[in-house]
Curated annotation (Swiss-Prot):
Lineage: Bacteria, Bacillati, Actinomycetota, Actinomycetes, Mycobacteriales
Keyword Cytoplasm attributed: yes
Recorded GO CC terms: cytoplasm; nucleoid
DNA-binding region: 97-102
UniProt entry tagged with the keyword 4Fe-4S: no
Name this protein carries in UniProt: Nucleoid-associated protein Lsr2
Subcellular location: Cytoplasm, Nucleoid
Stated role: DNA-bridging protein that has both architectural and regulatory roles. Influences the organization of chromatin and gene expression by binding non-specifically to DNA, with a preference for AT-rich sequences, and bridging distant DNA segments. Represses expression of multiple genes involved in a broad range of cellular processes. May coordinate global gene regulation and virulence as well as genes important for adaptation to changing O(2) levels. Protects against reactive oxygen intermediates. Dominant T-cell antigen and stimulates lymphoproliferation.
Gene expressing this chain: lsr2
Main location, first listed in the record: cytoplasm
Swiss-Prot/TrEMBL keywords: Cytoplasm, DNA-binding, Repressor, Transcription, Transcription regulation, Virulence
Length: 112
């Protein structure tokens, strides 16, 4: 019997819908990730804009925003779910949401 696992990322802020993107931001030396709908991601960026424009950039990437382009190509939700399922079956420790470690993604691609 085949088993199909579907993972749906839900907006972490209000839980009102499926998340469209993962937004990364930092404060006091701590980096955070939050899964948001496009509407809430735009609101977060808008709310932070005045603070960012008054601040100084001290590091980080100089790239345009993307959903998950980490140099390996974007991973869609179906592929992410498949990688997580493969990782668990093969003894890798992965969370149910958020970023999948690069070594797990590399191992998945090497095995498939």
């Amino acid at each position: 019997m085949a088993k199909k696992v579907t993972v749906t990322l839900v907006d972490d802020f209000d839980g009102a819908g499926a998340a469209d993107e993962t937004v990364e931001f930092g404060l006091d030396g701590v980096t955070y990730e939050i899964d948001l709908t496009n509407k809430n991601a735009a609101k977060l960026r808008g709310d932070l804009r005045q603070w960012v424009s008054a601040g100084r950039r001290v590091g980080g990437r100089r790239r345009g925003r993307s959903n998950s382009g980490r140099g390996r190509g974007a991973i869609d939700r179906e592929q992410s779910a498949a990688i997580r399922e493969w990782a668990r079956r093969n003894g890798h420790n992965v969370s149910t949401r958020g970023r999948i470690p690069a070594d797990v993604i590399d191992a998945f691609h090497a095995a498939t």
